[in-house]
Amino acid sequence: MNKSIIIILLITVLDAIGIGLIMPVLPTLLNEFVSENSLATHYGVLLALYATMQVIFAPILGRLSDKYGRKPILLFSLLGAALDYLLMAFSTTLWMLYIGRIIAGITGATGAVCASAMSDVTPAKNRTRYFGFLGGVFGVGLIIGPMLGGLLGDISAHMPFIFAAISHSILLILSLLFFRETQKREALVANRTPENQTASNTVTVFFKKSLYFWLATYFIIQLIGQIPATIWVLFTQYRFDWNTTSIGMSLAVLGVLHIFFQAIVAGKLAQKWGEKTTIMISMSIDMMGCLLLAWIGHVWVILPALICLAAGGMGQPALQGYLSKSVDDNAQGKLQGTLVSLTNITGIIGPLLFAFIYSYSVAYWDGLLWLMGAILYAMLLITAYFHQRKTTPKAVISTP
């Protein structure tokens, strides 16, 4: 594995750690500036600000990396993140925290750049495998982040921010020394020509060759993935009367299984049967998991359901791999930025929508949301089957 890939994976895991690192201590830090009555409001606004900045700036950073190269954008993001965490560590007013979260959302929107860099350095046949690695290490970071934040938060509410600033600074130096620009020179030159810098070109790049269907599929898969993320705690407490320990253990098992399927299994399936077949398999398995959780009330169903939900995560790297092979090198940043934005949008609307539906449906049937997820998958599978019959195996697009 070359040094650039290692740096890409390190940046990805550090971004994921950063998401969860401050969660345990942010309320404590807010207590220094706001009253108890307004704490929850400010906490929610800060989280929403971060997510909103990710939605806005992921495609922007992706496009900038197409134009100027992956390395400058990654170095800028790491430097900005290090300075931002220092700002938050030594904040003396509430507005400094708000500015810090805005900057964190901007500089943390590097998922598109990392995915673009990964597509630059990996052969097309192996992209699903390496996108699976990205998803796997991101999952590791999401597990480590809250644990580390809790441990460091016991020392001081400011300590997680100091740790994040130091770790980003170290990775900045490593990237400066060992990360080589991954984008081909001809792609950089092409993206700097006047005709490639028009607003219409940016907007129309994905209108070609029917990639809309697969972008919509990606969005719906990510949206369905917000169902367990939103209601798992409430659902298991209501149906199985679980305590926090049991819930925490089940989430840990789901996290480990998710990493396994994304980092190891997805790539092997894609190499053997292709990305589209892997996508169909993952949707079918995830649909089975949703049906199990919708109808079966025995606790023994949890393990097979968790396996199904985790295996359903293979659809994301497989779709990334397929879409990445379907665009030219000089459009990778735009593509990956679009995918990251779609993911972040589902992370905003999914919890709001599904929490609302669950709160009103639980009194009648607590399995309604799982059934809705299964129905969405069934509709996707049927639509995908007919879509594949009408389209050619590969739709190559280019930036005019």
UniProtKB/Swiss-Prot annotation:
GO terms for molecular function: antiporter activity. Pfam families: MFS_1. Resistance to tetracycline by an active tetracycline efflux. This is an energy-dependent process that decreases the accumulation of the antibiotic in whole cells. This protein functions as a metal-tetracycline/H(+) antiporter. The keyword Membrane applies. GO terms for biological process: proton transmembrane transport; response to antibiotic. GO terms for cellular component: plasma membrane. NCBIfam families: tet_MFS_A_B_C_D, tet_MFS_H, tet_MFS_H_J. Belongs to the major facilitator superfamily. TCR/Tet family. InterPro entries: MFS, MFS_dom, MFS_trans_sf, Sugar_transporter_CS, Tet-R_TetA/multi-R_MdtG-like. Keywords: Antibiotic resistance, Antiport, Cell inner membrane, Cell membrane, Hydrogen ion transport, Ion transport, Membrane, Plasmid, Transmembrane, Transmembrane helix, Transport. The gene is tetA. It comes from the Bacteria. It is a multi-pass membrane protein. The lineage of its organism: Bacteria, Pseudomonadati, Pseudomonadota, Gammaproteobacteria, Pasteurellales. Its main location: membrane. SUPFAM superfamilies: MFS general substrate transporter. This is Tetracycline resistance protein, class H. Signal peptide: none annotated. It is found in: Cell inner membrane. The chain crosses the membrane at residues 5-25, 42-62, 72-92, 94-114, 131-151, 159-179, 215-235, 247-267, 291-311, 337-357, 362-382.
